Design a protein with these regions (language model features):
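Membrane-embedded transmembrane alpha-helical bundles that form the catalytic cores
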Residues: 1-269
Length: 269
């Protein structure tokens, strides 16, 4: 069944899930929330709506497009049919870069990483550490490659999809990392779950609780197992620790400025 695009989530459970269900489910939910919230009007053309939900370039690996971005392009499809050499060239170049990331970096690196992981008892600290770093490279180039292929293919056809990665490994902290990594998913959770729960508007404790809820759901989205839920919760704790650290640092700086000002005032007097 995997050859025709379906996967079973457990060998003991005869449940079939189509490829990309986690992406187009969120895309459809986002559309529903936007219509309910008055951000857009409901699309009356079933074919245009179906194209929005199942837009094939980004169906398998994203990005998770918003109705406010992709749907207007579909509604005005006649305007993008005009041939544009620059657009097509840029789209093909983006696709080529995506294929390079996937085939020449991610797939090659995975051979080394899998060899070390599958035989971890044979390797020492240095090799295992290097494999961990290479695994991070593999994940980024694999996911980022798929996204760039999708964006490039869409661009060739005249559609502009959102950028899903912004050099995430150059992030200065975990919060900055999630602003750069899988941007479409992070922004989706922020707009449709975190903010409706109260965001950071209802006190510090509520903010941290909302963070735990969002990252717990995010972990479950990545994989239907407790491993992924724990992974999500760990990222939530890192976010909370980072926020507490920033708050403490801000208080220290503020108190230091007060002391400095008081000292200068005494000298003047």
């Amino acid at each position: 069944m995997t050859r025709i695009g379906f996967h079973t989530i457990d060998r003991n459970i005869d449940l079939l899930l189509p490829v990309g269900i986690s992406f187009y489910t969120f895309q459809a939910l986002g559309y529903t929330f936007d219509v309910y919230g008055g951000k857009i009007k409901a699309e009356k053309n079933i074919f245009k709506y179906a194209l929005y939900v199942s837009f094939f370039p980004q169906l398998v690996a994203g990005p998770i497009e918003r109705s406010t971005n992709l749907l207007p392009q579909i509604q005005n499809v006649d305007k993008i049919r005009v041939w544009n050499y620059e657009r097509v060239r840029n789209g093909l170049l983006l696709m080529a870069w995506g294929f390079f990331q996937k085939l020449f970096i991610a797939d090659r690196v995975s051979l080394l990483v899998n060899n070390v992981i599958n035989n971890y008892s044979k390797y020492g600290f240095v090799e295992l550490s290097l494999a961990s770093v290479l695994f991070a490279v593999q994940i980024y180039c694999d996911f980022g490659g798929y996204t760039n292929i999708a964006r490039g293919a869409a661009k060739v056809m005249g559609f502009e999809l959102m950028n899903n990665f912004a050099q995430p490994y150059l992030a200065t902290n975990i919060k900055d990392f999630w602003r750069r990594w899988h941007i479409s998913l992070t922004s989706w959770f922020t707009d449709y779950i975190y903010i409706p729960l109260g965001g950071n508007r209802k006190g510090v404790l509520r903010k941290y609780l909302n963070t735990l809820i969002v990252f717990g759901i995010s972990g479950f989205w990545h994989g239907a197992s407790w491993n992924y839920v724990v992974w999500g919760m760990l990222h939530a704790f890192f976010q909370i620790i980072g926020d507490l650290k920033s708050r403490c640092y801000a208080k220290i700086v503020k108190n230091k400025k007060r002391v400095t000002f008081s000292t200068r005032l005494r000298k003047i007097i």
